[in-house]
């Protein structure tokens, strides 16, 4: 290990750390997995990463244990940022916002999404595929995991917003990857180098198996698993887009050093209908009814999330400040009183955006009218401005972090990653998964996008 540290130190400008404390810290991410690395490298720039990749390629035969795992914020819930050999943490140095406009923005992978959004809001624009961990995650991880979140109902996942990537492939060289027309693709394939070989092999794969690959595409509302081969080559448009393989590949196909995202106008005049659902028997019907109104966002969380939020309410001072927390507490008093009529099984948040505040208000009112058939199973709250609805959006976005850091004598283990559940079977699915959770005496919360329930996180005894 000492030899590995010395050799890498001689290659890179950034720091190289093999201390026990650092290796222990990087043996974890937000998942339940644990792998202790040999060395952690903090690359200064793309050149540092290229040198490490070439070092591993040159020495892999003599030392098969060598491997590279890229890491930014370390919030991956499926173990994608832990490894036993070399960790490359890009969050320390490669975290800059490079350029922007109202249509696109370019940044380095170690930049936190919260900082990226602050920068894009200067252009009155956002990149809308942020996950619930928007205040914790980095944009490199969003690309690596093909992130999706509360805005994905309207806009889709990260794969739809990646315009250009700078990627280091296994030969240790950096390349620009972007959509190509057929003439540009043919030119790439004709290159007598490693890049040309990649394009030739991938094109042969997707062209020779075109019908099978297209038929294999899952017919679900959200899918971030595996390599999305069906998105790479489109015979009808003649576009070949290798970014579609890299997005969601968790660093297994190459290491991303620069990202250009397509942006959309920042939403204005948001309003939310909050639905406190006492029973879940008609949840599938309710979801389909709501979707007819084409909301911008449709989220939900269970009663355990709600009660945990009330129980750990002081935690919110970190994100809101003491004054903000006090204001939030006052706003929650009416909702706390509603709970005396019974704790809801689910809290649903239906958000609309419109050019004017009045249009948003009318959309919220109309949805509430159209859901009157469910009035015996639900309570409704019109939060016709973003400020009014903020209290519930904070609960939704912070639900995992509450379990992760605030439940005493327990450690958080996300034992399931994202799951797709058809709305029609949710009334059957939710009680059964809760039965399993209760059987093993776990404290767990369930939250997600309605129509595709996302994750189940549990806090288990130490």
Feature annotation, model-predicted:
Residues 1-57, 61-66, 73-103, 155, ...:
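N-terminal flexible segment immediately upstream of the FAD-binding catalytic core
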Residues 2, 15-20, 63-67, 127-130, ...:
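Flexible, glycine/charged-enriched surface loops at secondary-structure junctions
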Residues 8, 25, 31-64, 68, ...:
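N-terminal glycine-rich flavin-associated loop
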Residues 48-51, 282-285, 356-364, 428:
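Short, conserved charged micro-motifs
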Residues 148-235, 239-308, 344-346:
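Mobile "lid/hinge" segments at catalytic clefts and subdomain interfaces of large enzymes
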Residues 283-297, 312-327, 426-438:
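Short amphipathic alpha-helix segments
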Residues 295-407:
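Terminal amphipathic helices with adjacent charged low-complexity linkers/tails
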Residues 455-462:
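Conserved small/polar residues in nucleotide/adenosyl-binding loops
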């Amino acid at each position: 290990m000492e030899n590995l540290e010395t050799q890498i130190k001689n290659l890179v400008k950034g720091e190289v750390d093999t201390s026990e404390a650092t290796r222990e810290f990087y043996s974890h991410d937000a998942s339940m997995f644990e792998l202790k690395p040999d060395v952690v490298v903090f690359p200064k720039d793309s050149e540092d990463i290229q040198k490490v990749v070439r070092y591993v390629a040159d020495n892999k035969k003599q030392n098969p244990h060598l491997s590279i795992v890229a890491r930014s914020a370390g919030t991956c819930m499926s173990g994608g940022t832990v490894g036993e050999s070399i960790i490359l943490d890009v969050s320390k140095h490669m975290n800059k916002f490079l350029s922007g406009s109202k249509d696109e923005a370019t940044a380095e992978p170690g930049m936190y999404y919260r900082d990226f959004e602050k920068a894009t809001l200067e252009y009155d624009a956002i990149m809308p595929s942020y996950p619930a961990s928007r205040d914790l995650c980095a944009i490199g991880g969003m690309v690596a995991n093909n992130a999706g979140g509360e805005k994905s109902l309207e806009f889709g996942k990260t794969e739809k917003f990646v315009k250009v990537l700078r990627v280091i492939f296994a030969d240790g060289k950096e390349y620009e990857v972007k959509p190509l027309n057929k003439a540009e693709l043919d030119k790439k394939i004709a290159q007598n180098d490693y890049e040309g070989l990649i394009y030739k092999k991938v094109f042969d794969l997707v062209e020779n198996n075109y019908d099978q690959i297209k038929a294999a595409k899952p017919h679900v509302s959200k899918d971030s698993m595996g390599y999305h081969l069906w998105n790479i080559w489109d015979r009808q448009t003649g576009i070949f887009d290798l970014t579609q393989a890299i997005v969601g590949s968790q660093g297994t196909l190459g290491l991303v050093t620069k990202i250009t995202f397509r942006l959309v106008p920042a939403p204005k005049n948001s309003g939310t209908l909050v639905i406190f659902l006492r029973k879940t028997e008609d949840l599938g019907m309710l979801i389909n009814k709501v979707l007819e109104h084409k909301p911008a966002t449709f989220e939900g969380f269970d009663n355990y999330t709600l009660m945990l939020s009330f129980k750990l309410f002081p935690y919110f001072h970190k994100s809101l400040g003491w004054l903000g927390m006090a204001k939030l507490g006052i706003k929650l008093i009416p909702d706390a009183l509603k709970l005396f009529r019974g704790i809801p099984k689910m809290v649903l948040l239906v958000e609309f955006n419109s050019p004017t505040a009045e249009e948003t208000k009318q959309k919220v009112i109309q949805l509430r009218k159209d859901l009157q058939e469910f009035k015996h199973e639900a309570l409704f709250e019109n939060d016709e401005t973003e400020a009014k609805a903020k209290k519930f959006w904070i609960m939704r976005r912070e639900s995992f972090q509450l379990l992760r850091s605030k439940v005493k004598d327990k450690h958080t283990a996300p034992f399931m990653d994202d799951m797709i559940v058809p709305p029609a079977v949710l009334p059957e699915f939710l009680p059964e998964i809760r039965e399993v959770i209760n059987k093993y005496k776990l404290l767990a919360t369930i939250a997600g996008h309605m129509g595709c329930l996302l994750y189940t996180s549990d806090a288990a005894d130490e």
